[in-house]
Amino acid sequence: MGRLTADFAKAFSRDLKKNAKRRNWNLTELEKVIDLVVENTPETLEELRRRHNMHTLSGNWRGRYECHVANAGDWLVIWSSNVSVAFFERTGRHDELFR
């Protein structure tokens, strides 16, 4: 385990641009989640599991992780990672991401 580099899919950036202002998302909370993912220590992963309900996905999203951002209700982040990169793929609500 070690610090990862963050990389963002075009879809993630598009989701963020489309929804952040309209839904009044607190981007500081998103930055905190991204920092926890990128830090990639046992402590930060435990915090993601405990406070943000991080879990692995199945089906079309198999091999990826998902967690909730802060206490924002239905605001999710989906990412995958390898030994050096955390690749943030999508962000949004359940009904947008899991159609």
Label each residue range with its predicted role.
Residues 1-74, 81-87, 94-99:
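Basic, Lys/Arg-enriched alpha-helical interface segments
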